[in-house]
Amino acid sequence: SKGAYVTNNKQPITFKVVDEAGGSGVNLSTVKIKVDGTTYTTSSTGMVSKGITNGYQFVFTPQTALKDGNHTITINASDNDGNAATTVSSTFTIDTVPPTLTISSPAAGLITNKSALTVTGKTNDATSSPITLTMTLNGTSLGSVAVETDGSFSKAVTLAEGTNSIVVTAKDGAGQTTSITLSVKLDTTVPVLKGITLAPNPVSTSASVAITVEVS
């Protein structure tokens, strides 16, 4: 379809050429498809055709991988009386590379005593921007996250006591995704002083004393 994103750089291209009922029929020798300036005919390698009502259906598979980016298709044909059909053009975009995604903060494995946390980072896709960014916290969706024109993003979250799992996912226009999972621990438990041990028992004012404190 026009303007479609595809991830296959040898994407088969399907098209139909038909003549009106009662017409002279499609002249197969005139059917041509042009992909980015290179013209292919019904006898070209990669072209397959089959008859349908009043015409033909064609499937052309590029034999050389197309580059990532935008591509233009142009189709021409005539009937057996020499009447040329109106040229049809379409475009599509190939994107074989998932979006980039980096997390600036927090650091992986962070342990904090503050429940308020801001996740920041950057994402980009050279071929099929804009990026759709989503985030989950402990399996619960936090919805979409706004991405600035430079690819940066920022999202405030509230941590639960204990280990928290944060998953950030970037999705490009072709549907390819990149995800990063962060583990952040919230520890607000106050340490408890359980006991003090002096060893050995002091027997004189000049004795050396070792003090051990047990905290949990």
Set out the residue ranges of the language-model regions.
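Aromatic/hydrophobic beta-strand junction motif of beta-rich domains
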Residues: 13-19, 119-123, 211-215
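Proline-centered linker/hinge motifs at extracellular inter-domain junctions
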Residues: 1, 26, 98-99, 106, ...
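Short, solvent-exposed loop/linker segments at the N-terminal edge
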Residues: 3-9, 108-115, 201-207
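Surface-exposed, short loops/turns at beta-strand junctions within beta-sandwich domains
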Residues: 62-70, 156-163
